[in-house]
Amino acid sequence: MLTPRQKTLALLTLCLAFLTPFPARAAAPVQPHNPVVFIHGYNADPGVWGGLREDMRAAGYADSELFSWGYDTHRSVNEVVAGQLGAYVDQVRRQTGAAKVDIVAHSLGSLVGRWYVKFGGGTATVDHWVSLAGPNHGTSTAWACALWDQACRDMTPGSYVVKNLNAGDETPGAVKYATFWSNCDEVVNPDDSVPLAGATNTPVGCIKHNDLLGDDATSAGVRAFLAS
């Protein structure tokens, strides 16, 4: 039987146990994302990605994970621009310490990204590749400027670039591929030039070529795909 002194000590011990705060549960570590390299289209600039970048920041991406690349849209896709993209991807990987990047491209930028992935070593450095309204099998509207512009020639159906990108496997390596295309695209003709064999191909409805850049449903689809 406990003495009055022992009862008092036991009660004090019990009270102290309840008053002592439990150690705080450690917050779950934030999982970093792959750096995302955005590639704009013909006659455009990196500023076109403002809306999608804002959506991605709201979804948890840090500014340090988002990279809008600029390039001369009149140069040769395969001879000049794809190599410049490869150098930029290497720079991003060194800067972030990431093994791989994700690529999100619009229009002409899709051909640049594809050439880098297929012929420039990108199958080892790219995790996800996304094309918004890319002329992946060429577009007849490019004939309007093909006479004086190399990038326009590269976008024409049956061009050296288009033919080689689509020879054999259109989606090579372990890269995850996705395209988003509109049946009202006034730039890419025919509309079904965008989808690729082996990719996740998403129709977005009747949206103009440049409007895909600010379309909420397209943005949500891109973010969901990058998270897959």
Summary of predicted features, one role per range:
Residues L2-L11:
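Bacterial N-terminal signal peptides that target proteins for export
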Residues A10-T20:
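Bacterial N-terminal signal peptides
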Residues F22-A26:
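Sec/Tat signal peptide C-region and signal peptidase I cleavage site
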Residues P29-S68:
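Short, surface-exposed "cap/lid" segments of acyl-processing enzymes
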Residues V30-Q31, G121-T125, G168-A174, P195-A197:
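Short, conserved loop/helix-junction motifs that constitute active-site signature segments
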Residues V37-H40, Y61-D63, S68-W69, N78-G168:
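Serine-dependent carboxylesterase/thioesterase catalytic core
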Residues N43-G47, H74-E79:
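Acidic-and-aromatic substrate-binding clefts and catalytic sites of carbohydrate-active enzymes
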Residues E170-S228:
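C-terminal catalytic-base region of ester-bond hydrolases, centering on the histidine
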